[in-house]
Amino acid sequence: MAPYDEEEISPDDLLTNMIVMGASLIVIAAVVIGVVAGVDSKGGPGKLGENVTFDNVMGVGDVCNKTDYMESCMASLKPVGDKASVKTYLTAAINGTISEMTTAMEKAKVNADGFGDQSLEKMALEDCEELIGLSIEELQSVMPMEDVGDARSSVSAVIAYQRACLEGLKESLYSSFADFDRGLQKSKELASVVLAIIYENFPNDDATVDRSNQRKVLQDYNKGGQIPHASVAKDGSQEYGTIKAALDAYPHGIKGRYVIYVKAGVYEENVVVAKNMTNVFMYGDGVTETIISGTNLDETTTYRRATLSAIGDEFVCTNIGIQVPDKSSGNSMAAVKIQSDKAAFYNCRINGTTSNIYALAHRQLFKECEIYGVTNIIKGDAALVIQRSKIVVMQPSTPVANIITLQGRSDKRENTGFVIHGSVIVADESNSPEKLKNWTYLGMAVEKYSRTIVMESSLGDLINAQGWSSSNSYGIENVTFAEYKNRGAGAQTNNRVNWPSYTVITKRNDALLYTADRFIQVQKWSLDNIIGPLHAGLFS
């Protein structure tokens, strides 16, 4: 099978190529050609501790003037002194944010104790406790980091987690929502200050490097070439009968990947890859053979409603179908909720309804996958690249618009956004495209700085001529919606929205900013022997 980046591919060929992938294709060797560290836009990958500005002495006013919250910044940094090093100010801002978040976490814990175990309010407050705890861990990890891109990703995740906490409380109809929101406001502002200090004071080389012909090339595939640490079979023929049991056996302190093989079968369980389960690699016998279907979680919060929830960093999933349970009600349930950093899905089928993929935070790659969904298909505030995949839009049960992406970037310095690259967007074959033509949009502005880029992709005639949507013109001045070299009946841009924030990219160097190399720094990930030929640049 020719690599996807070497030829034009039709929707039918793309589907065929994904399905014929072998049952347990585990790579045993890789030859890396032209692997060059990714270069992000301003504030991208680079050595944080080695940056010459780290020890520069600056005035506190000069630092805070470059943030969006001057008053909170001055209140937090002024005690350090009128002049100090960037390192000192950054440390103070981080510590101030952690202090505010610790107070909020304790408040969530105390308030949760006042509700019954099955109440949505208690679940939402417990979710907040977890999300704020994760935020504190992210902030504590920033100063030791060597990579500016990693630091920006961590602080961007903090902003996403804070918003997810508040969204959950609002969803639960928590009576003290306004009070909790006010209590979290200071930490939200200080997290933005931390991100601004990193972004404004640790710029990297912005020179656009074209690496379109540089990719990691696999030397060989070998079925069963790597012995899994854990094997799962529903029929009892393997060591474990459930995926949960295999994950519970995760050996903390393991060096390298923890490999789980999931034999063909339908697994009706909700899988959670916990924060402390890093480098988990899970593979199956194919998207139609190994299927995780989940169980009904209607009476829980959005944060908990997912068939597969991956939190531990560097999670990889290949050759598996993931879907929501058939009996899930009108409450949106994600097939995949992903907040694992440097995570990848390869040759997977993700089949859901509303909010099919909840890309909550951090950086992810979906490569050569099928994604089925309806209404709000992909949401969250991650830096997500969907590459060489097929997005199938299904008919809504009610006359509402299909929105393919709802990207939740709320701070202009976050390194997050959704990129659909070299992919195919079509209507479900069981529906006439005419039914969807006036109802399907590439994306919607849901936050002030929402960002979605669709490039080098095939767009079917289901796409509305305007292309993009907004609620009451919200965000149209500041979002980033862009297209580059798309094709197909839905790719015509002459009738697209006339917004200041919508762009048809014409310069190759501008498009390069959104490749897997530049946008999520995929060349630095440990994927050499797992997900097939990795194209990091443009396809044309």
Predicted features by range, described:
Residues 15-17, 136, 140-188, 192:
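Amphipathic alpha-helical hairpins/coiled-coils and adjacent low-complexity
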Residues 3-4, 12-80:
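Terminal alpha-helical segments
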Residues 63-67, 74-77, 83-155, 159-162:
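Extended, amphipathic alpha-helical segments that serve as helical scaffolds
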Residues 105-112, 143-146, 166-173, 198, ...:
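Long, hydrophobic, amphipathic alpha-helical segments used as structural scaffolds
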Residues 2-3, 9, 13-21, 48-50, ...:
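Sequence-level preference for short, compositionally simple segments enriched
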Residues 74, 147-169, 365, 449-463:
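Hydrophobic/aromatic-rich, well-ordered segments within soluble, folded domains that form packed cores
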Residues 103-107, 142, 161-172, 429-431, ...:
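Extended, well-ordered alpha-helical segments in internal regulatory regions
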